[in-house]
Design a protein with these regions (language model features):
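Membrane-interface motif at the C-terminal end of an N-terminal transmembrane signal
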Residues: 18-30
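Short, solvent-exposed mixed-charge patches
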Residues: 232-233
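Alpha-helical transmembrane signal-anchor/signal-peptide segments
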Residues: 28-41
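Short extracytoplasmic
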Residues: 41-67
Length: 233
């Protein structure tokens, strides 16, 4: 005969199992699909053009566990006759979950010996009343100083901190969605100043504007893409 305690325990286990099943994502959202970042991001952006360079801090090392986070990456140096050079890294991962998630620059720069300071939120104005949240920070090593401006996209959300990123993933999980994600990072080697960060933001705005409307969701998600389209941008 099954006693009352066993019945209660069994009921609790069934409830827990049902809750776990409800929180198990079932729909995988991928905005890149079969396309390549190399083809999406123009080699000429405003009055900047790409030039070969090896001066990059990449978000992963080939063959490492973190390399599993990213299915596609692009690293380019853009130079301009009348502005600062801009190093651009775009890293895309088609799976964002508890085991695999984007590494924010605060993590990957610190991992190779940089000190992180002056981390502040900012925005790119993509069109009238259309703003993209970004984060600005300074990475310093013995050999160089890098002002950095970056954003991350998880599904259709644009978290600017690690805690926001974790909260977004939980919300997506509750909604039954397995999101993709992208890191877009712009930096230069210079002493940090308002003028330098302003140029990084200007480059970021020009980069989004230069990407075809059909490809913009890969970098900024469908909501901001639709808002830009509605604003005529």
């Amino acid at each position: 005969m099954i006693d009352r305690r066993d019945l209660l325990l069994g009921g609790a286990m069934l409830t827990a199992a049902a809750g776990a099943a409800a929180l198990t994502p079932h729909r995988h959202v991928q905005f890149l699909g079969s396309r390549k970042l190399e083809d999406i991001i123009p080699r000429h952006i405003g009055n900047w053009a790409d030039r070969p360079s090896e001066a990059f801090i990449l978000p992963h090392d080939p063959g490492s566990l973190s390399a599993q986070l990213y299915n596609d990456t692009v690293a380019r140096l853009y130079v301009s006759p009348n502005s600062i050079p801009v190093m651009v890294v775009v890293a895309y991962g088609n799976l964002q979950n508890d085991q695999l998630q984007l590494h924010r620059p605060e993590v990957c720069y610190a991992a190779v010996g940089f000190q992180i300071s002056a981390s502040t939120p900012a925005e790119l104005t993509l069109a009238r009343n259309v703003r993209l949240p970004v984060r600005e920070l300074v990475a310093t090593s013995d050999s160089r100083v890098e002002p950095i401006c970056y954003w991350t996209r998880i599904g259709d959300a644009m978290p600017t901190t690690g805690s926001q990123q974790r909260w977004v993933k939980l919300q997506q999980q509750i909604a039954g969605i397995i999101p993709d994600g992208v890191l877009v990072r712009m930096s230069t080697v210079a002493e940090p100043s308002q003028e330098v960060f302003s140029e990084l933001r200007r480059f970021g705005t020009a980069m989004v504007a230069s990407i075809a409307d059909v490809n913009r969701p890969v970098l900024i998600g469908p909501t901001l893409t639709a808002e830009m389209r509605a604003a005529g941008a």
